[in-house]
Design a protein with these regions (language model features):
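A short, well-structured juxtamembrane/interface segment
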Residues: 2-19
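Glycine-rich phosphate-binding "P-loop"
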Residues: 1-2, 73
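Glycine-rich phosphate-binding loops that contact phosphosugars or nucleotide phosphates
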Residues: 19-149
Length: 149
């Protein structure tokens, strides 16, 4: 788990260890919505990567068979304690996926099964409310650039 790395470094480290073929975005409510712009960006630009976007419970009860060691799961939970998203991280980890989580609370339950954690300042001020979406977009851009060139 690492919260000091930038998106570019995180993706570089992941791509150095595994051949990324599938990116899955997982969350509930507003956090799921905050992941959507990155999913849309990859849908429109990726030619090789498989892209999925699930509510956490959908992921938990109908986990795609394609989730494996070549999958990056990007999860988000504002406070890091949404039970369904915490469970989704555990399931993804059990399937061998690399998990990147976005939250604002250090050592939240969401971070337990995450390989990488990005903390955002959602509660600090109005402008910070876009940080979660922004960080997720940075991850998507880096995935596209480093996986597909």
């Amino acid at each position: 788990m690492n919260s000091t790395m930038e998106a570019k470094e995180i993706i570089k480290e992941i791509v150095g260890k595994t051949e990324v073929k599938h990116v899955v975005f997982v969350g509930c409510g507003a956090s799921k919505a905050d992941l959507y712009p990155a999913k849309y960006f990859l849908d429109q630009n990726a030619k090789q990567l498989r892209i999925s976007h699930y509510t956490a419970n959908e992921f938990n009860f109908a986990t795609p068979t394609s989730v494996d060691e070549n999958t990056v799961v990007i999860s988000a939970s504002l406070g890091g304690a949404t039970p369904e998203t915490v469970e989704a991280n555990a399931i993804a980890k059990d399937k061998g996926a690399t998990v990147i989580s976005l939250t604002r609370i250090v050592d939240a339950p969401l971070t337990k099964d995450a390989d990488y954690v990005i903390y955002h300042g959602f509660a600090e001020n109005y402008a910070a409310k876009l940080e979660k979406t922004g960080y997720c977009l940075l991850l998507a851009v880096e995935l596209l650039n480093q996986v597909e060139g």
